[in-house]
Amino acid sequence: MGRIKSSSGRCSTARLEAVAVLVVVFGVASSSLRGCIAQQSGGGLTRGSFPEGFVFGTASAAYQYEGAVKEDGRGQTIWDTFAHTFGKITDFSNADVAVDQYHRFEEDIQLMADMGMDAYRFSIAWSRIYPNGVGQVNQAGIDHYNKLIDALLAKGIQPYVTLYHWDLPQALEDKYKGWLDRQIVDDFAAYAETCFREFGDRVKHWITLNEPHTVAIQGYDAGLQAPGRCSVLLHLYCKAGNSGTEPYVVAHHFILAHAAAASIYRTKYKATQNGQLGIAFDVMWFEPMSNTTIDIEAAKRAQEFQLGWFADPFFFGDYPATMRARVGERLPRFTADEAAVVKGALDFVGINHYTTYYTRHNNTNIIGTLLNNTLADTGTVSLPFKNGKPIGDRANSIWLYIVPRGMRSLMNYVKERYNSPPVYITENGMDDSNNPFISIKDALKDSKRIKYHNDYLTNLAASIKEDGCDVRGYFAWSLLDNWEWAAGYSSRFGLYFVDYKDNLKRYPKNSVQWFKALLKT
């Protein structure tokens, strides 16, 4: 997953428990509450609650699922390096095996089909296609993803393919520091074109990047995820990096990389393949801590430093004016030619949404003095508590509070700010702990997860039917319990329980039956 989390596609990291303040802060985002709010719980959801053609699926990521890290010519990635660095992963695990989907994809596709899922969002490992990031194509990698795509289509499941879900080839990190160098734009575009050419006859929905905001913050500001660069707390945690500049450089290159890939697709492949390209943005929703003007403005500003940072250039041709004013010369500028290519380069908006926080104006200099980073630039503080009371019930991950109304508010924000773009919820879900003292039988009783999906989907349906938001699909994170980035195997997001002690056997949680009933009605 991707998120301040480590996830899913999330970015959840259990290590944030030791630095709860950093957790909240580094997942900045927010805006004033808009739109009507549906009840926290809703009943009677069916397929008919959503428009005709609305897509239901589950989501995954290559590094979290595949395993087989040294098979069939796959090259090393920055996450291989990070996971094998002592102290980086909460449970000291790695994803060398993960849930072994590389070998078990046919079994897992059958699980999706049995539930009645329409689509599967998975990522291609760049280092399986180009082991060194560039150069010679690895045919074994091409063959594997052809088999996966064909197997999905044979079961009537549409592939939604992510090109980059955090697993940069280590060779490019070694060669020129990866996303910090402008060369990455051309190398990513070349990799993307190879995927368009090889798989585009069957893949009609491409997600070029998963959670670029999470990568910029967790990888280059907080240093809690690969490649683990930062300068916060006087480099006590990271050996190298600059938290005040590198996140902005990396973000700029992400935006240019998507635009370059989109330009190639539209010029050479769109006419014959007729696919669409988007990005999966990680977006927390934030409500003002109070109804004061200063907190309302802080919430808006925080959201601009999250979604606006990465989405505004595609709709308006530049970063938010608030960022220009507060970041100054540290925020890169688009040339006129670059802005022309970037603006309009999104066919749809992917949203990875899990939780909602309160946001207030930061009226102290402590954060700026200690961190000197993007959080300090926002001038905000985001917390899941107000007056000592949590904003909602908490899942297992310390960052994940269950606030279904945030889904509807966020959809209205996207509709209003970006003039009703097509939206897919590319990730949404919650986790349980990997508790060794709970039996498998009890672990399958996930009523909390059922309520989570029911309530978030109820608010999503209301945003479509009552508010006119153009939302076209929903992907649950995740099909299986899996390796959750810096949280390792300590966090279970799956609809299916994976027995890590017994050959990775898959067992359906009660939420599987809930989705099956939803999708059949």
Curated annotation (Swiss-Prot):
PROSITE patterns found in the cross-reference section: GLYCOSYL_HYDROL_F1_2 (PS00653)
Recorded GO MF terms: beta-D-fucosidase activity; beta-galactosidase activity; beta-gentiobiose beta-glucosidase activity; beta-glucosidase activity; cellobiose glucosidase activity; glucan endo-1,3-beta-D-glucosidase activity; hydrolase activity, acting on glycosyl bonds
Protein's UniProt keywords contain Heme: no
Keywords: Disulfide bond, Glycoprotein, Glycosidase, Hydrolase, Secreted, Signal
Subcellular location(s) per record: Secreted
Disulfide bonds: C230-C238
Glycosylation (residues): N291, N362, N372
Annotated a beta-D-glucoside binding sites: Q64, H165, N210, E211, Y354, E427, W477, E484, W485, F493
Family listed: Belongs to the glycosyl hydrolase 1 family.
Function: Hydrolyzes glycosides, oligosaccharides and hydrophobic glycosides. Possesses gibberellin ester beta-D-glucosidase activity. Can hydrolyze gibberellin A4 beta-D-glucosyl ester in vitro.
Protein name: Beta-glucosidase 6
